[in-house]
């Protein structure tokens, strides 16, 4: 049984009503409920009486160090079997981290710990790592985004990676560890004992110099499946250093996120060699890089090669124009693996959209998710999209948010959605406005097709 409450300021009466449930439910989520240290006394008592609890989520509550201490004391019961604990954005500071080593030691069932958005600092991180190094700790997932960590935190983290095979997922994104810190962390990642599967280092101040170390890591660590390096200034030079590791026979990477990494069409050439050779790579994000139409052409040519089995490609905000759509269209008619294509925030216009729709209307196309938000689509472009919805049997999600579409365009789309042969399940229209007449027709459509969601 789950107790799941979000964004509700709990009155005294409501809190009294909930307390008995805290002692019974397997999953308790009280996110952004205005909880404070005073509530934590009750929470701790309730947790001691609940041997069934497997997940506790108290995100975005002003618990403070003292409140978190009370909650953790409640979990340190011999009968506690908690597996997932989320204390994200709970005002936990370095001063409150002293209890973490004993907590991790006493909770051998704990597998996930979320501490993001707490100012732990390097000193708090060191205390956390003491607990992670305990033989009784079997944590598998650790999230530490926005924790005010610096390069000084990387040696303790590297020690954990060298010492435990249990940890599978580590997120340290949005911390200023910099080039030097990433190099130290890489030493732990390269250790043979490290069995990490997911590493997230987004917006960590990495530079092209770090990519040589990362190359060695992805080449040698067959366990690594997901690598997130977004919002780091790697540049084309860094990508050139990284790609030989991705091409290694030992690399089994499935997901690679390189959004906003200062990559151009030149960097695409190196990545394309990886796409053509690595059937294991399934997801690639290059969003926010100035690839241009030339970069798009190179990617599409790679997606036509038999060695490429990519399933998801994000090229949002990549300085693409309608000129790239001929290459994208050809790829869509021949590629049978790509299921998701994110093209939002590119100046494709109605002419580009028309070309894409003609391709996707061909029999045998397999794309399921198409994102065209902020692509300068007008009511005229909706005519092509409406025809596509009737011709295509594979497309399930379409995002047209933030385009110049009004009643005429929306009505064309609704006309197709109303047809029994339309297979679309989700249409996203954020920042799109229509009249009450169109709204009435939309509500009637959702009532007659319960499997369809229109999100606006």
UniProtKB/Swiss-Prot annotation:
Subunit structure: Forms high-affinity heterodimers with RNASE1, ANG and RNASE2.
Classification via Pfam families: LRR_6 (PF13516), LRR_RI_capping (PF18779)
GO molecular function per UniProt: ribonuclease inhibitor activity
Protein name: Ribonuclease inhibitor
LRR repeat feature ranges: 15-43, 44-71, 72-100, 101-128, 129-157, 158-185, 186-214, 215-242, 243-271, 272-299, 300-328, 329-356, 357-385, 386-413, 414-442
Location of N-acetylmethionine modifications: 1
Function: Ribonuclease inhibitor which inhibits RNASE1, RNASE2 and angiogenin (ANG). May play a role in redox homeostasis. Required to inhibit the cytotoxic tRNA ribonuclease activity of ANG in the cytoplasm in absence of stress. Relocates to the nucleus in response to stress, relieving inhibition of ANG in the cytoplasm, and inhibiting the angiogenic activity of ANG in the nucleus.
Cellular component terms per the entry's GO annotation: angiogenin-PRI complex; cytoplasm; lamellipodium; nucleoplasm; nucleus; plasma membrane
Domains: entry comment: The LRR domain forms a horseshoe-shaped structure that interacts tightly with target RNases via a large protein interaction surface on its interior side.
InterPro entries: Leu-rich_rpt, Leu-rich_rpt_Cys-con_subtyp, LRR_dom_sf, LRR_RI_cap, NLRP_innate_immun_reg
Modified residues (Phosphoserine): 86
Organism of this sequence: Sus scrofa (Pig)
The gene coding this protein: RNH1
CDD domains: LRR_RI (cd00116)
One GO BP: regulation of angiogenesis
Location, primary (coarse class): cytoplasm
Keyword check for Acetylation: yes
Compartment(s) of residence: Cytoplasm; Nucleus
Keywords, sorted A to Z: Acetylation, Cytoplasm, Leucine-rich repeat, Nucleus, Phosphoprotein, Repeat
